[in-house]
């Protein structure tokens, strides 16, 4: 059998290796989450026309395109830089929260550089809080967005049966679904970041105890 000190060193080596592998996967999935967040923010496919809608078209957070009359040609309007052009105050609020989520997760990626200068555990915990805040912003954005479905522009596309949280003849599109999936992603990543941060704290404590026993 191996001496206790050697067994402890082997365990610690495997522990560090596994933590690093999980940390790399966490960083990769954080980057993918950032891409998803950006796509959800910029793509205008949150809701769209259906078989029975009066007009063709689709809506995003701030950009939307609607047909006119019998023509299938779409007229597009709306820009985040022109906040007043967004057709509903609910859409404006949703745009703000989804935009904040995007900024937070991109800032989290920027914090990866801190791994070279700061305690690994501290960086993980900072990123964990950022990801949790990003997930919270996504929740708020996704919950507020349907409150704007009673806007005149949405009713023109989806029919008079459209109202707050009632989509009428339209349907939910992929960008909205992706944003909802992003909430779960953010929660899992933030939980993993806190776990990794606490594991790093535990590893540092073990190293300090090992140094003390070695000196003794």
Swiss-Prot record:
Keywords: Membrane, Transmembrane, Transmembrane helix. Pfam families: L_HMGIC_fpl. The chain crosses the membrane at residues 22-42, 96-116, 126-146, 177-197. It is a multi-pass membrane protein. Its main location: membrane. GO terms for cellular component: plasma membrane. It is found in: Membrane. One of its GO terms (biological process) is sensory perception of sound. Belongs to the LHFP family. This is LHFPL tetraspan subfamily member 3 protein. It comes from Danio rerio. The lineage of its organism: Eukaryota, Metazoa, Chordata, Craniata, Vertebrata. The gene is lhfpl3.
């Amino acid at each position: 059998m191996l001496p206790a000190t050697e067994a402890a060193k082997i365990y610690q080596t495997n522990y560090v290796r596994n933590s690093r592998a999980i940390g790399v996967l966490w960083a990769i999935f954080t980057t993918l989450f950032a891409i998803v967040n950006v796509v959800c923010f910029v793509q205008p496919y949150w809701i769209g026309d259906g078989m029975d809608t009066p007009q063709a078209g689709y809506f995003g957070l701030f950009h939307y395109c609607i047909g006119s009359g019998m023509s299938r040609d779409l007229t597009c309007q709306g820009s985040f830089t022109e906040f007043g052009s967004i057709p509903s105050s609910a859409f404006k609020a949703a745009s703000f929260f989804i935009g904040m989520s995007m900024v937070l997760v991109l800032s989290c990626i920027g914090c990866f550089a801190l791994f070279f200068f700061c305690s690994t555990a501290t960086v993980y915990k900072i990123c964990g809080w950022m990801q949790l805040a990003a997930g919270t912003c996504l929740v708020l954005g996704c919950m507020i967005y349907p409150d704007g479905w009673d806007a005149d522009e949405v009713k023109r596309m989806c029919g008079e049966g459209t109202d707050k949280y009632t989509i009428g003849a339209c349907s939910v599109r992929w960008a909205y679904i992706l944003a909802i999936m992003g909430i779960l992603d953010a929660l899992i990543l933030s939980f993993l970041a806190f776990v990794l941060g606490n594991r790093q704290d535990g590893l540092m404590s073990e190293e300090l105890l090992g140094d003390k026993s070695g000196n003794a």
